[in-house]
Amino acid sequence: MDRKKKPLDVTASSLVDLKAELFRKQEEFKQEKLLKDSGVFGKPKTINKKPSIWSKQNAGVTSRAEKDAEQKLEEQKTLDKAREKLEEKAKLYEKMTKGDFLDEEVEDMYLVDFTQKIIVKRKEMEVLGATRESQIEEERDDDDKEEFSDKDIPPPQDPSEEWVDYVDSLGRSRRCMRKDLPSLLEMDKNLQGRLFVSPANEKTLLSEDMRKELQRQQWEEEEREALKKPMGPIHYEDIRENEARQLGVGYFAFARDKELRNKQMKTLEMLREQTTDQRIKRENIKEKRKAMLEARLAKLRQKKMKKSKEDGTEEEGREADGVVPEPSEPKPVPAPAPVAQNSKVEVIIQERRDTKPGVPHIREWDRGKDFSFGFWSKKQSELRAERDPEFAPPSNYFVGQKRTAPMSSQPQSRPGSAPSDLGHSSGQSQEPSSSHTSTPASESSPQAPTVTFQTLDDMISYYKQVT
């Protein structure tokens, strides 16, 4: 069939709509053209952009939301049913507690004995009612006692036993016997003094002008009193004028009256003398006790000294007691004569002044520590004989050493004299020994011995051994 000859199924209304749409588009085009010619840009056209990931919803969100809404409706129905059941149970429980049972057979079905509960509750109510009635009766009795008139009080046999009324410091009306009235009034005065409000607290409620006026009045009153008084010395209390400074516990505020001030000063002086006397007495008692203790310690030391002398260990006893004999003052060592170039080198061995005779030297950091100093069980010669010759010092260290001072015949019995015996050798007959004596009875120490060396090497080797 030919297309040109095919009739179009077009109605009149569709043609009118098409013509109207065409006319509207032509008008919009004209308006945009006029705006462009005038330089005014119209509203930009909206462009459909790609939706972002945040605006895009997950698949199945709407279906899940519908399911949630249905589930909420079901839950709400279940909750409503449970609430209705609970309300029915509560109403039934109230009826049963009141005793409104439907039937006795129904009562046996429940595990709770509601009849016994009703009986117990009624008993509790009766007890509470009885206690309330007793309290009400007691209150009435108290009111009746308070409302007794003077006619109900019997006449007193003695005028001092007469009942009287008075008002205390707090504004309360009181009743007591006439004989007790003075003591009660005195107590009331004491209470009123304790409850007195200080003027400083009252002044906080005043304005600045009123406070200044009060200060001016106080100053005028003080000046009038000062004019009435005779001329005399001015004290600190006269010029303090309510100073806010705190002066500490050592400060005493004397009275402004001369007689009272002198009396206070005499009292303070007397107290000071008493304190001084008590302090002196305590010092004297302390000194007496200390002297008695020292005397007892001296007796104990003497006893131990006697025992140690008998045993031949006098020094050990003194060390155990912590008593050390005072060292005798060493005689001044004569200065060595000037040495010639080819003469021998002389070395003078001096005593250590920081140690006591017969007592080993104790370092400062070792004071107060306990040390046990025993005796040599063997002689020095025996020990040197037992020593391995491999560990002995070389014999050439002591070649040419000669002792000019006489050797001490008394052997050393304590290891405290070891520092002076370090230079001994097994092959030498003449050995430098300590010049200290172990007997504390000696009043003066001997002169320091001198050692003569032929060469400087001998002297250095000797000092290596000694130190």
From Swiss-Prot:
InterPro entries: CCDC174-like. Keywords: Coiled coil, Nucleus, Phosphoprotein. Its main location: nucleus. One of its GO terms (cellular component) is nucleus. Residues 136-147 have a biased composition (Acidic residues). Pfam families: CCDC174_GRSR, DUF4078. It is found in: Nucleus. It comes from the Eukaryota. Residues 47-76, 129-163, 301-365, 379-454 are annotated as: Disordered. Residues 406-415 have a biased composition (Polar residues). Residues 64-76, 349-365, 379-390 have a biased composition (Basic and acidic residues). The modification Phosphoserine is found at S198. PANTHER family: COILED-COIL DOMAIN-CONTAINING PROTEIN 174. This is Coiled-coil domain-containing protein 174. It comes from Mus musculus (Mouse).
